């Protein structure tokens, strides 16, 4: 994987979280784009066609679960890797994420270095 061509879409309604997670990924050379909710994420994903979407579950306007389901049905972006990053760590939340089509589910808080390591793997 070439970090310079690898596009990541980070989606969270908390600007501080987007900034904390974006910084180390950008320092590693990844192309990082951000969105604040599921609706923005879908629109941006169609435009930039990211390799990975890191998606919060609980957001206004459209939550991550619904956004994931819509992404999986869109042939243009359906093969995009999707990782949920959520404060909801209950089994039923993780199961809902995987049932929606997620490839991975990580619970917050996550150290930015750990996220970078997961992206690289």
Question: Where is each model-derived feature located?
Answer:
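Charged docking surfaces used in two-component/phosphorelay signaling
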Residues: 19-27
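Short hydrophobic/Thr-rich beta-strand motif most characteristic of the beta2 strand and flanking loop
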Residues: 29-36, 44
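Active-site beta3 strand of CheY-like receiver
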Residues: 48-54
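Receiver (REC) domain active-site loop signature in two-component systems and cognate sites
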Residues: 59, 97
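C-terminal output helix
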Residues: 109-120
């Amino acid at each position: 994987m070439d970090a310079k061509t690898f596009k990541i879409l980070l989606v969270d309604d908390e600007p501080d979280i987007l900034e904390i997670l974006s910084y180390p990924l950008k320092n590693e050379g990844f192309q990082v784009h951000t969105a604040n909710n599921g609706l923005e994420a879908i629109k941006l994903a169609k435009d930039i066609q990211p390799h990975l979407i890191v998606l919060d579950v609980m957001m206004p306007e459209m939550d991550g679960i619904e956004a994931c389901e819509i992404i999986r049905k869109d042939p243009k972006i359906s093969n995009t890797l999707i990782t949920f990053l959520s404060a909801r760590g209950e089994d039923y939340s993780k199961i809902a994420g995987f049932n929606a089509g997620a490839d991975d589910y990580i619970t917050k808080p996550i150290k930015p270095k750990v996220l970078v390591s997961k992206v690289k793997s």
